[in-house]
């Protein structure tokens, strides 16, 4: 072999495997194309948008990222009607190479039902993994357009936005003495199930053949195939994008023809929304008809029973919180129904742990308490946190009393409440696999720092390079907050 041929052979890149994929480079390549799509959308160059979408959906990086998204989300091990799962790295890599538009035909969805908090069942339609990956691939090409065209005060299913942003916007709208005294709580009847296919196919800037195939795939239930003539499946990865595109423009519709003195403001999270107004008559006679007309064009309608107009002094619920004014002071507190749901979960978890170790119980209980506290930490939740801590303490005392019915209270306190070195903290000492001694303590909700959330800018677009430093700064700030929460002395595994 010559030196030249030897050099050529050594420069041949190794075969691609799932573990050797340079994921930062893959994400960078996809984001670069997405930013070009967003720029073309802003300029109204729709032919260029279509061309860039084609490039993105046929790129290897986007296909790899689509499969990565499908195989890392919570439903990765839930199969569709074909009962296929991607367990190995080779299967994942082959799945990415198999994402091709030519000859593609989606399989029907698998219909299952999941319980809702009110006891009813919610239908969930599950695509196959291959169909999920195809949807994830085309969602990468649709997301920059949806983000560019989105309403300023839409916060659900959008990159860089969350429930806390929506609630903070509500606070800004309602906290002042001169803020609107009336609120319309909007509820869309079966939003995901009733969106008009005709409207989506006419207005959504996506490959029409692919979109039509997904919308009309049908679903299997009890060995019977049912057609789908309306709606977008709640189990589909592209469904939240389609729902947002259908509902964007609602903010402009409710504000059309209003004046500053009408105090009409709008906030939406997915299909939940609120509209403020200076008078009940304004919301009833002007805003509500505008909403009805807007939704009718999309095959949707308001739920007359659940769409109500409420004075802010009475309060209303939004995203698991109760927003109510006491005099001139607006408070955002955890909704009573959500507190009760948490109490029920705590009770069932502790009851089911009678035969488990203290450490096993804490490893189940702490993530539940910490997650709930972090969600409600931006409102007036301190009093609720304290009451819940006492509730947990009572349930745990009953749990240990049942385990040791003949032991004294002093003995129980020494065994179960002394390892952390703090009086009254439910804790246990354990050893790691390396033999190191550690203490696992109950997470105290009252130790959670209450702080105002810094709302995202209404015009911020993660696919616009002008906002790249802005979102990077917000990301770093969020990690600092999470880090402080995660390393609180109570509830974490810490050295003794």
List each model region and its residues.
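Charged boundary/loop elements
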Residues: 16-75, 140-156
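Phosphate/adenylate-binding "loop-and-lid" substructures adjacent to NTP/NAD/dNTP-binding pockets
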Residues: 50-121
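Conserved polymerase palm-domain catalytic core
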Residues: 98, 102, 149-153, 157-161, ...
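Active-site-adjacent bridging/hinge elements
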Residues: 105-117, 212-227, 363-366
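Short, solvent-exposed helix-loop connector elements
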Residues: 123, 227-232, 331, 347-361, ...
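A conserved non-catalytic segment of reverse transcriptases
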Residues: 297-372
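Extended C-terminal regions of large enzymes
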Residues: 393-395, 400-495
